[in-house]
């Protein structure tokens, strides 16, 4: 046993210090980025925000809606091969280039993914997603996937430390997904005591990944557009959003009505709700590590997408970054004890 004395920070612990700027308008800020990925050699350009691979967020409808903003969607892994084929046949090439196929690490997952990618060669992203990316089996699966699909851009996660980020990139991942426990409907930290404050995880993993020519996704912990800006400021190449994109028309959650008001169910992928739906319940040897919440219906996701992108542009103008790529170079974080004046928050 040992204790690390270094302070670790989340998004709520900091603000971004403003700096002199020559930008005249938020409209001068370019949010689009271009990446060429280490192993696949693929090039992608767009706004590096990703809808999370949760079945109440990462739907085909969400992918179609967000593609118009050049935003990516990691489509959840519970669609069948037939559903994938039908979607790919009806979607435009522009939509498909903003879509990630998600998979677990079982033999069944591998065979299903193989069928999807063979039938739909226009799909270029593969997101290999498990709650705990520290297992030897997971690293072996990433290597197996890289060998099977050398020209696909592979995302692997989740981890929160530099050495594991490096191991996954060396095993064949182009992009590493960073975050254990920060999600709005994740209870891993309270059920297990395991986790890492998200901003510090992003800073550490970005340094490790960039040293090897890889990229990272900050996954979880964002509750508002300012948090998205902080994640990019900390060095994230992409930011994945779950709760911020839940509850919309495209989110796919079950709609319930209470006292004349409609709500949409949103749950973590390790919650009892998710396991009841997909694997027949919570196994006796494990605990649920997620919760279910009811969100007021929020309308089309385009309004939220515009809000997030507008907040990002504004953050860039405050520090003089004319492009999103420059934000991390222009970011100085200051530690704080308050984020906002909350006097009217209850009204």
UniProtKB/Swiss-Prot annotation:
Superkingdom, taxonomy of origin: Bacteria
Q: Which reaction does this chain catalyze?
A: IMP + NH4(+) + NADP(+) = GMP + NADPH + 2 H(+)
The UniProt entry, under HAMAP family, shows:
GMP_reduct_type1
- Which UniProt keywords are present, listed alphabetically? Metal-binding, NADP, Oxidoreductase, Potassium
The record's similarity note reads: Belongs to the IMPDH/GMPR family. GuaC type 1 subfamily.
Q: Which InterPro entries match?
A: Aldolase_TIM, GMP_reductase, GMPR, IMP_DH/GMP_Rdtase_CS, IMP_DH_GMPRt
Q: Name one Pfam family in it.
A: IMPDH
Query: Which amino acid positions bind NADP(+), per UniProt?
Result: 108-131, 216-239
Kindly give the CDD domains that the UniProt entry links to this protein: IMPDH (cd00381)
* Gene name tied to this protein: guaC
The record's SUPFAM superfamilies line, in alphabetical order, gives: Inosine monophosphate dehydrogenase (IMPDH)
By its UniProt entry, which Gene3D superfamilies does this protein fall under? Answer: Aldolase class I
* One BP annotation, GO: purine nucleotide metabolic process
* Physiological role: Catalyzes the irreversible NADPH-dependent deamination of GMP to IMP. It functions in the conversion of nucleobase, nucleoside and nucleotide derivatives of G to A nucleotides, and in maintaining the intracellular balance of A and G nucleotides.
Q: One GO molecular function term?
A: metal ion binding
The taxonomy runs: Bacteria, Pseudomonadati, Pseudomonadota, Gammaproteobacteria, Enterobacterales
- Which source organism? Enterobacter sp. (strain 638)
Broad EC category: oxidoreductase
Q: Which residues bind K(+)?
A: 181, 183
Q: Which residues form the active site?
A: 186
By its UniProt entry, which SMART domains does this protein fall under?
Answer: IMPDH
GO CC aspect terms: cytosol; GMP reductase complex
Q: What is its EC number?
A: 1.7.1.7
Record's protein name: GMP reductase
Its assembly, as annotated, is: Homotetramer.
């Amino acid at each position: 046993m040992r204790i690390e004395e270094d302070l670790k920070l989340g998004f709520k612990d900091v603000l971004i210090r403003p700096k002199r700027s020559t930008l005249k308008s938020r409209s001068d800020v370019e949010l689009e980025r271009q990446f060429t990925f280490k192993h696949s050699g693929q090039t992608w350009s767009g706004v590096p925000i990703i809808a999370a691979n949760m079945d109440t967020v990462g739907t085909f409808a969400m992918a179609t809606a967000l593609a118009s903003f050049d935003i990516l969607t990691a489509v959840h892994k519970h669609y069948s091969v037939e559903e994938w084929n039908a979607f790919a046949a009806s979607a435009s090439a522009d939509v498909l280039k903003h879509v990630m196929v998600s998979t677990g690490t079982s033999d069944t997952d591998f065979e299903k993914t193989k069928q999807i990618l063979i039938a739909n060669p226009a799909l270029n992203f593969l997101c290999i997603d498990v709650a705990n990316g520290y297992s030897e089996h997971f690293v072996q699966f990433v290597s197996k996937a890289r060998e099977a699909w050398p020209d696909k851009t592979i995302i692997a996660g989740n981890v929160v430390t530099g050495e594991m980020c490096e191991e996954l990139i060396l095993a064949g991942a182009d992009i590493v997904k960073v975050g254990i426990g920060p999600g709005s409907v994740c209870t891993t930290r309270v059920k297990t005591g395991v986790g890492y404050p998200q901003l510090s995880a992003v800073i550490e993993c970005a340094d490790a990944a960039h040293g090897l020519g890889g990229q990272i996704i900050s996954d979880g912990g964002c509750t508002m557009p300012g948090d998205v800006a902080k994640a990019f400021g900390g060095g994230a190449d992409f930011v994945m959003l779950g709760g911020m994109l839940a509850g919309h028309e495209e989110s796919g959650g079950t709609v319930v009505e209470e006292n004349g008001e409609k709500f949409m169910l949103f749950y973590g992928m390790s919650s009892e709700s998710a396991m009841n739906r997909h694997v027949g319940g919570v196994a006796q040897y494990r605990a649920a590590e997620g919760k279910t919440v009811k969100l007021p219906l929020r309308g089309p996701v385009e309004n939220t997408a515009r809000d997030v992108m507008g907040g990002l542009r504004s953050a860039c103008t405050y520090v003089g970054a004319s492009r999103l790529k420059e934000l991390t170079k222009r970011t100085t974080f200051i530690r704080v004890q308050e984020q906002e004046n909350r006097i009217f928050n209850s009204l």
